[in-house]
């Protein structure tokens, strides 16, 4: 059986922490910032740790090699 390949789109969008959690960029920051409050824009900076159920899907299907 051949090796499982990591999805190339997933390796650009997700990272794994040392404990195996999945880190992704914040959603909702591409356009339309003028209608958002300053608090919303500020809170959407940086990255976000995905919930356990979503992280399990990403690790199993898209990042088999970590």
Swiss-Prot record:
InterPro entries from the UniProt entry: Ribosomal_bL35 (IPR001706), Ribosomal_bL35-like (IPR021137), Ribosomal_bL35_CS (IPR018265), Ribosomal_bL35_sf (IPR037229)
What Pfam families does this protein's entry cite? Ribosomal_L35p (PF01632)
Molecular function (GO) terms for this protein are: structural constituent of ribosome
Organism superkingdom: Bacteria
Per the record, the GO terms for biological process are: translation
Which keywords does the record carry?
A: Ribonucleoprotein, Ribosomal protein
A GO cellular-component term linked to this record: cytosolic large ribosomal subunit
Q: Does the keyword Lipoprotein apply?
A: no
The entry's family comment says:
Belongs to the bacterial ribosomal protein bL35 family.
Q: What is this protein called?
A: Large ribosomal subunit protein bL35
| Organism listed in the record | Azorhizobium caulinodans (strain ATCC 43989 / DSM 5975 / JCM 20966 / LMG 6465 / NBRC 14845 / NCIMB 13405 / ORS 571)
- Whichever gene encodes this chain, its name is rpmI
């Amino acid at each position: 059986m051949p090796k499982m390949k990591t999805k190339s789109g997933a390796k650009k969008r997700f990272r794994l922490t040392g404990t195996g959690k999945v880190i992704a960029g914040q959603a909702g920051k591409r356009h339309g910032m003028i209608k958002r409050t300053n608090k919303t824009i500020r809170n959407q900076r940086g990255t976000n740790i995905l919930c356990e159920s979503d992280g399990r899907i990403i690790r199993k299907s898209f990042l088999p090699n970590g």
